[in-house]
Amino acid sequence: MRASPKVFPGDRDNPLLHLELRPCNIAPIRSQPMSSSPSSFVQRFLPLRLPRVCLAVTGSDPSELLEKAEGLVRDNPFLEFRLDYLPRPGLALPKIKRFFELNPHAVVIATCRRANNGGKFKGTVASQLDLLAKAAGAGCQLVDVELQTATKCRPEQLQKLRTRAALILSFHDFHATKKLDVTLEKMCGRPADFFKIVSTATTLYDNVVMMRLLEKESDRHSLVGLCMGEQGIISRVLGVRAGSAFTFASVSPGEQTAPGQVTAQDLRSVYRIEQVDAATRVYGVVGDPVSHSLSPAIMNTALRRENVNAVYLALHAKTLKDLLACVRDIPIHGLSITMPYKQAILEHLDNTDSHTTKIGACNTVVRAQDGKLYGFNTDTAGVVRPLEQRITLEGARILVLGAGGAARAAVFGLKERGCEVFILNRSAAPAQKLARQAKARSVKRPDLRKLSFDVIINATPVGMANTRESPLNENEINARYVFDMIYDPAETRLMKMAKERGAQVIPGIEMFVQQAARQFEIWTGKPAPWDDMLRVVTIALQERAAKAAAKK
């Protein structure tokens, strides 16, 4: 029976020592018999199971670094001190020692990343190793040494360091994800307790490559693996279930120490990384670009509220081929499809409902257990549901502005509900074609002053990028309700003019939430928590508006 790790004085209440423990997968060093077992430090002092999230902490001087750490450590006991960010990192050592005296439960990685490996340290290898050894002496339980640095050291130097702290041997590729197995093989020739391999995802499928390495090798080695960049979000969230010992997070959105790093708050609260396991289902929003999407916030809120073991990610797909390979191999169970793929995805689906076929666009994909892909369009629900809550749709006169994908969803959905639908588009031909297909009526702009409607729906982007623009003039607004599909900004010029004309307005946020709610229902079979979803999006839009105003 394995002996329990030695407890530091004052660590009786250390929460790390009361976690569920499992054997630590320490790398067998094939070319170094002396390192085929955990280092003496690991055996004596390191918790057998580290928290899943390590916060990377930086500072412009030792006081700032340690003050940040003091504010974080209660809720985040696993930290990385980026000593290379300090102009004179040696000055931090007394403060680090004092930090551990006050916070004996903390587990800290000391990192002094060299400039040619994405860090800021420009000193000699000897000074780097000396600093890490002193950081270990001050209390840091783990130290990070780059593979390039290790190749310039004798094995005995690394072994000596391992007597004072657990050694993480790290490799970073800031350009691509390639030959990960070859990289690991090189690393295995040197003494270490953890092997950290970080690449850059240039495709979504690079995450699959990384996670396959973790799944294959984590039983033989203690690995930390993830992909950097916007497209690396999959491995940052799901890598821990593939075998990564932990992942890294930033303190706040502006303090990333690597491209694509997610904040600790988002990893825990939005993506629920502590609960991710083999049974966790994966969903995502797909587009190019997709970084602006509010869908992860709204969908993960709904999944958490309804106790669904699933996670929803933003997937920046540059090609459908890349996306579909991930759907198959991760696997991904459902997708929200955004621009530019709503039409292109159709030919890759095994079946669609008749409504989606009519519209000619798909915004929702379900992956069945047999791997087949089924397409739906929930934009119709996004239009119909808000209106049903306010008026009787049968016989209602509704003007739709636009003839694109969103307009098509509105027109066909409203015709199915018995509405009399009119279509106005800047170019007459698309409006006339849509009118013929849906058995609606196309109108010309001069006709608007003679017509009245129950509802006017703006299904164009006019008023979004340029907030001073409106698709209609004030004297052309002759309706009881004006429904603008644009949800950012929250109030468009069209909506302001409609209020001045005495019309009631329906904000685009309602369409966004209702179409998402319908997606949630299709995927889970559960009623969507509408109120929670609306609240999250409202707050997110307010925060986005405040940030934009602060930059002006």
Where do the PLM segments sit?
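Active-site beta->alpha loop and helix N-cap motifs at the rims of alpha/beta catalytic domains
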Residues: 45, 50-72, 76-160, 166-168, ...
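Catalytic alpha/beta core domains of metabolic enzymes, predominantly
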Residues: 148-279
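Glycine-rich adenosine-cofactor-binding loop
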Residues: 227, 283-289, 387, 391, ...
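Phosphate/diphosphate ligand-binding glycine-rich loop within oxidoreductases
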Residues: 280-391, 489
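NAD(P)-binding Rossmann-fold cofactor-contacting core
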Residues: 417-438
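Rossmann-like adenosine-cofactor binding region
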Residues: 436-506, 510
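Adenosine-phosphate binding glycine-rich loop
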Residues: 485-552
